[in-house]
């Protein structure tokens, strides 16, 4: 009689463990899909930001200003290109990691978990560095630099700045999601 009670208890504990494991996998999958969406959106938003405007430049005070058509694009700034590239890499990695984790549902080895953990750590570093680089250039465009006489770019290309700006918090959120994934990965390691 006592033996049956222990078996029932073990069965109930096993069922509870399976539910917790399943819910953890569900949280991980949800977070990876969120990271995929955030990185894709950040790369797209910054990649398509563009504005063309006619700018008047006065070369000599006695002559009339010269009107020049100028375009502001993310591809003209290496920090923005880096941020787009980092987001594209993170997006691709996330898609691959989702596929790998879906294929290896119940058969996740310690090696696979370690590879995913390291990949997630690399994505955290890349996304934070991309955010930092793009933020530095964005602030330079927003405020200029009086010491080297760089003018505010966002005063001239306001639409470009407003279109490019949302990519920074999206990238930052993606980095935070990857940080939580690193914590989840570390918890899963025995």
From Swiss-Prot:
Pfam families cross-referenced by the UniProt entry: CASP_dom
Subcellular location: Cell membrane
All ranges on the Cytoplasmic side of the membrane: 1-28, 105-111, 185-190
Recorded topology in the membrane: Multi-pass membrane protein
Extracellular side: 50-83, 133-163
Main localization of the protein described in the UniProt heading: membrane
Coiled coil feature spans: none
Keywords: Cell membrane, Membrane, Transmembrane, Transmembrane helix
Annotated transmembrane regions: 29-49, 84-104, 112-132, 164-184
Domain of life: Eukaryota
Region (Disordered): 1-21
Subunit relationships: Homodimer and heterodimers.
Protein family membership: Belongs to the Casparian strip membrane proteins (CASP) family.
Record's protein name: CASP-like protein 1E2
Phylogenetic placement of the source organism: Eukaryota, Viridiplantae, Streptophyta, Embryophyta, Tracheophyta
């Amino acid at each position: 009689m006592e033996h049956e009670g222990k078996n029932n208890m073990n069965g109930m504990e096993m069922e509870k463990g399976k539910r917790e494991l399943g819910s953890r996998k569900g949280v991980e999958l949800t977070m990876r899909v969120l990271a995929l969406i955030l990185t894709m959106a950040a790369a797209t938003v910054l990649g398509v930001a563009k504005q063309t405007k006619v700018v008047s430049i006065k070369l000599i005070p006695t002559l009339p200003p010269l009107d020049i058509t100028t375009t502001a694009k993310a591809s003209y700034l290496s920090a923005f290109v880096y941020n787009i590239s980092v987001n594209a890499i993170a997006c691709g990695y996330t898609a691959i990691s989702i596929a790998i984790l879906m294929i290896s549902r119940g058969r996740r080895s310690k090696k696979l978990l370690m590879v995913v953990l390291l990949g997630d750590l690399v994505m955290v570093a890349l996304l934070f560095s991309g955010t930092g680089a793009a933020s530095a250039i964005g602030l330079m465009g927003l405020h200029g630099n009086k010491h080297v006489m760089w003018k505010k770019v966002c005063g001239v290309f306001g639409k470009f700045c407003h279109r490019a700006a949302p990519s920074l918090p999206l990238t930052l959120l993606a980095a935070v999601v990857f940080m939580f994934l690193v914590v989840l990965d570390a918890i899963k390691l025995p």
